[in-house]
Amino acid sequence: MLHSIALRFEDDVTYFITSSEHETVADAAYQHGIRIPLDCRNGVCGTCKGFCEHGEYDGGDYIEDALSADEAREGFVLPCQMQARTDCVVRILASSSACQVKKSTMTGQMTEIDRGSSSTLQFTLAIDPSSKVDFLPGQYAQLRIPGTTESRAYSYSSMPGSSHVTFLVRDVPNGKMSGYLRNQATITETFTFDGPYGAFYLREPVRPILMLAGGTGLAPFLSMLQYMAGLQRNDLPSVRLVYGVNRDDDLVGLDKLDELATQLSGFSYITTVVDKDSAQLRRGYVTQQITNDDMNGGDVDIYVCGPPPMVEAVRSWLAAEKLNPVNFYFEKFAPTVGN
């Protein structure tokens, strides 16, 4: 049986390989042209030491000097000995360039673009049917602005493995990409992008999940939720999304969230708007909408994506309330403007 192995490098690059159950991760990587740092291949030197963030595996044979028992319990692995038993995510303690990873660049043809809200643009790119865009739900791509050498980072709002990818883009007045999308982009136009990138992705759902989204920070959560719905599992934990924006007309993707609520058992969401004149049921910041049930006595995984002030506000709120979730994952984003 072949397993998918996502190798995450120190420079934020992720590369996917396949590995059989009787093949070490290092050998599989070498078959894909990736040179994980090695000195021995026998579990003796510890040079290839990495960390398994997700998945089940056989750690193989090694000496204590290469990998201590405490390190092994924490999830550290030696790729030269590790054999995957399921799909895995392995953090490699080296840069992608040091491992001779070739950048994964793809092209997509625009098939749809519309204004999701007064402040958001959303668009879809069709990928060559013979290709597949691999990424972990929640990760992002670097999209090239057509006619320039500049690129911008946007989270995938679609699920992995599809022949189409979608993105949400905040419409920034002086933004180069949003300006291009608003004024120049045409259907059938070709865009170039590479990736995937990022440490913000969905881990194995084993306990209740609380998602906190600010503005277009909703995008990675749409990817995560579609992925979970696609699993068609009845044993998934509950998922609660609190989606915050500044104004009513900043809200986007509600139809998709309603659809996901019918597809994913245990998923629910609420919206909250900062504007005191909002017509929405809830007003204020996302932290004002978090309940004791959401926190589940601390037995919860929290994912946060939004502008830096929002992410820091959530951190501060948790500290002030003396709340300690089992895991806290976050991604901050800010617009790039000007020339």
UniProtKB/Swiss-Prot annotation:
Lineage top rank: taxon: Bacteria
Q: Flavoprotein among the record's keywords?
A: yes
Q: Which cofactor does this sequence's record say it needs?
A: FAD; [2Fe-2S] cluster
The gene that this protein is the product of is cbdC
Q: Relate the protein's function as given in its record.
A: Electron transfer component of 2-halobenzoate 1,2-dioxygenase system.
Record keywords: ATP-binding included? no
Positions annotated to bind [2Fe-2S] cluster: C40, C45, C48, C80
Show the Pfam families listed in the entry.
FAD_binding_6, Fer2, NAD_binding_1
SUPFAM superfamilies per record: 2Fe-2S ferredoxin-like, Ferredoxin reductase-like, C-terminal NADP-linked domain, Riboflavin synthase domain-like
- Cross-referenced PANTHER family, in alphabetical order? NADH OXIDOREDUCTASE HCR (PTHR47354), PROTEIN RFBI (PTHR47354:SF5)
Reactions that this protein is recorded to catalyse: 2 reduced [2Fe-2S]-[ferredoxin] + NAD(+) + H(+) = 2 oxidized [2Fe-2S]-[ferredoxin] + NADH
Q: Would you tell me the protein name for this molecule?
A: 2-halobenzoate 1,2-dioxygenase electron transfer component
Provide one Gene Ontology biological process annotation.
Answer: benzoate catabolic process via CoA ligation
